[in-house]
């Protein structure tokens, strides 16, 4: 289990106490921070509540900050920061971030890894619990008149969402046998 996932479920338990959690993230209908939380609350006899979501998010973000202070920044894949910077400079390409995380936690992790995302539209689970809707909204923020859309993701739920949307999927990281270094890759 990743540090991120451990901190996420630890934050839920700090706010709600002992709760039942499904065995795998893939067991949730929407593998996003708000999607998992909504289903976890329902599984444990609670109704989704914005105040509970805000409380869990605050504890989670503070846990991420503590992790960064003690362990250092979240690492970027070699060359990823430069790759994104280069794409942002291209006239024929657009960049948006679609994340299943909450906005505050996503920004914190990305900035700690060295990404400058100030001018990049970001859509998160604050906007929708559905990954497909998050991805559609991110595309809408940059215009949807493209010949093709390529999505870089690190999990099978990203891959499934791309299949649903008809987008090209590029696996990132070891879990899907994807890109482990952007060094030398021409966008």
Give residue ranges: language-model regions.
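Active-site neighborhood of HAD-like aspartate-dependent phosphohydrolases
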Residues: 1-26, 43
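Conserved phosphate-coupling serine/threonine residues in phosphotransfer and NTP-handling enzymes
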Residues: 99-101
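N-terminal glycine/serine-rich phosphate-binding loop of ATP-dependent small-molecule kinases
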Residues: 5-8, 14, 47-52, 59-63
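Asp-based, Mg2+/Mn2+-dependent phosphohydrolase catalytic module
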Residues: 47-51, 85-86, 104-187
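An amphipathic alpha-helix signature
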Residues: 5-9, 33-34, 38, 57, ...
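Short, basic/glycine-rich phosphate-binding loops at helix/coil junctions
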Residues: 58-67, 114-117
